[in-house]
């Protein structure tokens, strides 16, 4: 895990090699298992336009409560298990007390034509990890921060942590064909009080 505290164009934390080799394999395997369980935006707390239309077009699942029926008894999602490593990065860099926060874990998948229009999250910090099996199979999908005209590419195993009140969007994904599981997976951890 390579952690970099960045101040430009806004304060954020960038993590490269977010997972070690074994963890990354475990996460990709879990994503393969989760893929058929993913649901539309009406089930993943999507932000909405003024007319009530969802701002996102993708699929996802909250791991904290929706996945439990699919897990072996006593077995927790590896993605949920690993989130504590990331939580420690926030606690160590911003001097927060762990016990004051609740974490929610959302897995999302962006295939051909999918996007998430500009929005803020109702939380303190948002953390997004990109997981892509083959970046050559798609284009687009950058996490864009319109107030700063700045974006981060969806590179496998890279994480960004930023204040949830910062407007952000996922730019449209383009693919010659919607190859299942070869678009962009994101794991979003939302830190709330």
Question: Which residues does each predicted region cover?
Answer:
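Catalytic core of non-heme Fe(II) oxygenases with the double-stranded beta-helix
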Residues: 84-193
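Non-heme Fe(II)/2-oxoglutarate
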Residues: 1-94
């Amino acid at each position: 895990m390579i952690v970099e505290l960045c101040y430009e164009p806004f304060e954020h934390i960038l993590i490269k090699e977010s997972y070690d080799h074994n963890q990354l394999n475990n996460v990709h395997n879990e994503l393969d298992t989760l893929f058929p369980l993913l649901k539309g935006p009406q089930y993943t707390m999507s932000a909405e336009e003024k007319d009530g239309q969802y701002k996102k077009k993708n699929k996802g699942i909250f791991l904290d409560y929706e996945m439990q029926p699919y897990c072996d008894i006593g077995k927790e999602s590896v993605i949920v298990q690993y989130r504590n490593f990331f939580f420690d990065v926030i606690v160590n860099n911003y001097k927060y007390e762990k016990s004051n926060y609740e974490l929610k874990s959302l897995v999302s998948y962006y295939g051909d034509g999918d996007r998430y229009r500009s929005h803020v999250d109702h939380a303190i910090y948002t953390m997004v990890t990109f997981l892509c099996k083959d970046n050559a199979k798609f284009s687009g999908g950058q996490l864009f921060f319109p107030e700063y005209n700045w974006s981060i590419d969806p590179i496998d195993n890279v994480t960004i942590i930023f204040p949830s009140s910062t407007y952000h969007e996922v730019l449209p994904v383009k693919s010659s064909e919607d190859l299942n599981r070869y678009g962009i997976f994101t794991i979003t951890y939302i830190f709330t009080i």
